[in-house]
């Protein structure tokens, strides 16, 4: 008689453990699937952002090329550099 009762309890315990493992598996699957779909959405948004930035960079290059001043002669450039160098030297504190 003991064997019949114990075997019934073991079957129920085995069934309960199986159901608990199944529920834990489903919950894990839900959260992993949800995280994966969010990641895919973020990747799509980042790709769209990258595409927009490439377009903006191309437009900025066009604007810079259109507004680019004529090439100045070397003397003017050198004098501007020397003035800038002097300004930088003035900013540096003496020790």
UniProtKB/Swiss-Prot annotation:
One Pfam assignment: YebO
Subcellular location: Cell membrane
InterPro entries reported in the protein's UniProt record: YebO (IPR025594)
Topology relative to the membrane: Single-pass membrane protein
Entry's transmembrane regions: 12-32
Keyword Transmembrane: yes
Keywords: Cell membrane, Membrane, Transmembrane, Transmembrane helix
Domain of life from the UniProt record: Bacteria
GO cellular component term of the entry, any: plasma membrane
Name of the protein in question: Uncharacterized protein YebO
Source organism of this protein record: Escherichia coli O157:H7
Gene behind this protein: yebO
């Amino acid at each position: 008689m003991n064997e019949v009762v114990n075997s019934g309890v073991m079957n129920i315990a085995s069934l309960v453990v199986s159901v608990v493992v199944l529920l834990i598996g489903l919950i894990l699957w839900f959260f992993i699937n949800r995280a994966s779909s969010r990641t895919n959405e973020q990747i799509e948004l980042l790709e769209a952002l990258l595409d927009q930035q490439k377009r903006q960079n191309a437009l900025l290059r066009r604007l810079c090329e259109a507004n680019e001043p004529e090439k100045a002669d070397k003397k003017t450039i050198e004098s501007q550099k020397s003035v800038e160098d002097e300004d930088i030297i003035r900013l540096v504190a003496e020790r």
